[in-house]
Design a protein with these regions (language model features):
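Short beta-strand/loop motif that positions the catalytic acidic residue
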Residues: 229, 235-237, 241
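Catalytic active-site module of serine/aspartate enzymes centered on a nucleophile-bearing elbow/loop
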Residues: 259-340
Length: 340
């Protein structure tokens, strides 16, 4: 039998698989007997991060943060997220509240072989994160809260009507014209996909029971007792955040008074610091406050905190170099494959 040879005029390309189209949703039966939908993206040897998205988000909302996917992989961070009750493709169970969800999350982490885990909550993910870390505080490596509810913020009654959100879910996600998210190519389009997935993945006529329950839990459930938490905590807030104002951060700092804490308050920024400073959150997960993400001259650097003021005074900015590109700059052209 003749040996198989490459065609004499063939170019060899490096591609051997499909490129990612966002996190892959998996399902597993956990200890309670319930089936959970989850994502698990990253190597087994990477730092595990449990991600809890904002109010009404599905497990694929993490895709909105994958504009820094290569940076996350370079740092070596594995992301696990568990879809909340009745959202996305998860079946609604009226018996599943904050504590039941927390138990299912820990059961899944046990199955995945994850012991110590960093926990990140964005916005409406805050109360769920509190229930999770209160259940097993000794297994929390670090806690990261990005403009996260401690309890239902005041002045949000009009925003938290499930039927109103269901009538126009995209409006729930609408960012101001000056928001930094508009600098991220494709972000607004991806937001529309997430908004509709959150409410209509099971069909147009399925009632928004999961979202309704979440809104009720925000109002009725007090912040869990976190006095047993010893892991370092990192808080990220915009000083101009009107949806989750700084008073909410104060509730967290009081509840976590016994922990080492880093507060990152960004002047004049609003309810989008979770995107604009996602790179810093990743760095804090990896280095536990030991590095600041900053860039200058098109180069991203991880500097020590003591150098931050001098670096910024010399023309640097916080964040990866992509944030230095003008918002109206055209997309970078595809550079083409490297053939050999």
């Amino acid at each position: 039998m003749k040996a198989v040879r490459d065609a004499s005029e063939a170019f060899q390309v490096r591609n051997t698989g499909f490129d990612p189209m966002g996190p892959v949703v998996c399902s597993k039966v956990v200890g309670s007997g319930r089936t959970v939908n989850y994502i698990d993206d990253g190597g087994a040897g990477a730092v595990p991060l449990l991600f809890l998205g904002g109010a009404g988000t599905t497990v694929r909302a993490f895709r909105l943060l994958e504009f820094a996917r290569s940076f996350r992989h370079e740092l070596g961070i594995r992301v696990v997220s568990v879809e909340r009750n009745g959202l996305g493709q998860s079946v609604f169970d009226p018996a599943v509240g904050l504590d039941e969800y927390a138990a299912d999350v820990w059961s899944l982490l046990d199955t995945l072989g994850i012991g110590q885990v960093s926990v990140l909550a964005i916005s409406g993910g805050g109360p769920y994160a509190a229930a999770i870390i209160a259940a097993r505080p000794a297994q929390v490596r670090s806690l990261h809260l990005a403009c996260a509810f401690a309890e239902r913020p005041e002045r949000t009654d009009a925003l938290m009507e499930a039927d109103t959100v269901a009538a126009d879910p995209v409006a729930w996600w609408r960012f101001p014209a000056d928001s930094s998210v508009h600098s991220i190519p494709g972000f607004v389009d991806s937001v529309i996909e997430e908004a509709t997935r959150g409410l209509f993945a099971k069909g147009r006529d399925v009632p928004p029971d999961g979202l309704s329950q979440a809104f009720r839990l925000y109002e009725s459930e007090p912040l869990r007792d976190l006095t047993s938490v010893q892991a370092p905590a990192f808080l990220y807030w915009g000083s101009a955040d009107e949806l989750v104002p700084l008073e909410q951060m104060g509730r967290w700092t009081a509840a976590l008074a016994g922990t080492a804490m880093v507060e990152r308050v960004y002047l004049d920024e609003g309810h989008d610091v979770q995107y604009r400073h996602w790179d810093q959150i990743l760095a804090d997960v990896k280095f536990l406050g030991g590095r600041i993400v900053a860039s200058r001259g098109g180069r991203t650097q991880l500097i020590v905190p003591e150098e931050e003021a001098e670096f910024l005074a010399a023309g640097g900015i916080l964040g990866i170099a992509a944030w230095q590109r003008p918002t109206d700059a055209p997309p970078e052209p595809f550079r083409g494959p490297t053939l050999r």
